[in-house]
Structures are given as structure tokens and as C-alpha cells.
Design a protein with these regions (language model features):
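Axial heme c-ligation environment in periplasmic c-type cytochrome domains
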Residues: 48-54, 69-112, 146-151, 169-203
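Bacterial N-terminal signal peptides
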Residues: 9-19
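Sequence context surrounding c-type heme c attachment/ligation sites in exported
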Residues: 28-35, 56-60, 64, 122-134, ...
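The feature marks the first
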Residues: 25-27, 31-73
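Short, solvent-exposed interaction modules
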Residues: 108-149, 157
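Bacterial N-terminal signal peptides that target proteins for export
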Residues: 1-10
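Electrostatic cytochrome c docking/interface patches
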Residues: 17-34, 48-51, 101-127
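The canonical Cys-X-X-Cys-His
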Residues: 37-44, 95, 130-139, 196
Length: 205
């Protein structure tokens, strides 16, 4: 039997504290540095490819951390190997600021998954040690930008499902020493992953 600690969701959030040094970027400068990103993520950060993430409107601090993690290899994305090697930290901060300043477009939702997805997102499944997603990502999926917790609302369901699966099998491991996302995702079955990803895609920031 899984024993649940008090304030479990709050503790999970605290474990996700962002470690990267971040001083903020300049969106105007960032716009001049994203040309090589446009093919996969769109000129305004709204990728039309469901397997590639939308970056528009994402929290600046979170974006910087992900860019830095990709650059150092802490987050492994085969298609991005070497693409960020010539950028310094200020360049990455500027790119993050540019995408954060853009407006996200709406995503496609598979209605058949919405009810289960809503239940998992809002309430989790405490019998299996799955907390709700709202503690860190908010009731409407807007995240917590100052703390570095990502906005999920409106993201492509396909991309979200792949990331949850990657966390569950350990292919993605840049969630900090607390292993919060890995611990949660490995408790979810494939239907729950697909459902919560579809529900999140339909949320509006």
C-alpha cells in the first residue's frame, strides 16, 4: 500500500525548484536569434507539428532552463544536438523572452479522452500515488512562471503524451533531483497519459 504524506502536492512542487542561473532576456533581441527554430516551432513559437512543442506564451524561466538543458545534454533531443552550441546564456535568455512574449494558438482536442483527463488532472488518483496536476501547473494549466513551473494549457496533446511517456521510462530526466515528474508518470498507464494530455490541450491560458 502506498502511504501518502501530508501536503504531498506542495512538496512535489518544492522539489522542482529551478537550478539554472537566469537573469532575464530581451524579446526584441531574441526575435533576431530564432530563425533556425522556425521550421520546427513556427515563427511565433506556435508549432504546426503535433510532435513539436508550442513555445509561444511559455514561461520565460522554464524556457531558458529547457534551452540550457538541451545545450548541455541534460535534456536529450536528437534533432537539436549541436543547434544551440554557438549561443551563450544571454542568447538563450533572449530567445526565451521572445517566445514567452508571443500568444499561443488553440490546440485540437480528442473529446473521448476529456472526462478521464479532467479527473486525473484535477484530482489525480491517490490510490496509486498520482497527485493532481493543479498544485504545480494550476487549475487552468497556466503553470507558475516565476517558479519555473511550465504552462501546459493548449500544448499539443501528442507532444505532452510523449513527454509523459519519456518521464515514465526515464528517457527524460531533467525534472530535478526530486524526480517528481518521473515518479508521477511511471504510475500512470497509457490511457491516463493520453487522457490527461488531451484534456490539457483543450485548456486555455
Amino acid at each position: 500500500m502506498i502511504k501518502h504524506r501530508p501536503f504531498y502536492t506542495l512538496i512535489l512542487c518544492l522539489c522542482l525548484a529551478v537550478q539554472s542561473v537566469w537573469a532575464g532576456g530581451d524579446a526584441a533581441s531574441g526575435k533576431q536569434k530564432v530563425e533556425s527554430c522556425n521550421a520546427c516551432h513556427g515563427a511565433d513559437g506556435n508549432s504546426l507539428i503535433p510532435s513539436n512543442p508550442k513555445l509561444a506564451g511559455q514561461g520565460e524561466r522554464y524556457l531558458f532552463k529547457q534551452l540550457k538543458n538541451v545545450q548541455t545534454g541534460e535534456r536529450e533531443i536528437a534533432m537539436m544536438v549541436g543547434l544551440l552550441d554557438h549561443y551563450n546564456d544571454q542568447d538563450l535568455a533572449d530567445i526565451a523572452a521572445y517566445y514567452a512574449s508571443q500568444t499561443q494558438t488553440q490546440s485540437f482536442v480528442e473529446e473521448k479522452w476529456v472526462n478521464l483527463g479532467r479527473e486525473i488532472y484535477r484530482n489525480g488518483n491517490l490510490d496509486r500515488g498520482i497527485p493532481s496536476c493543479t498544485g504545480c501547473h494550476g487549475p487552468s494549466g497556466t503553470g507558475n512562471a516565476p517558479a519555473g513551473f511550465p504552462m501546459l494549457a493548449g500544448q499539443h496533446a501528442e507532444y505532452l503524451a510523449v513527454q509523459l511517456k519519456n518521464f515514465s521510462i526515464g528517457n527524460r530526466h531533467n525534472d530535478g533531483e526530486g524526480k517528481v515528474m518521473r515518479d508521477i508518470a511511471e504510475r500512470m498507464n497509457d490511457n491516463e497519459i493520453q487522457a490527461v494530455a488531451s484534456y490539457i490541450a483543450g485548456l486555455r491560458p
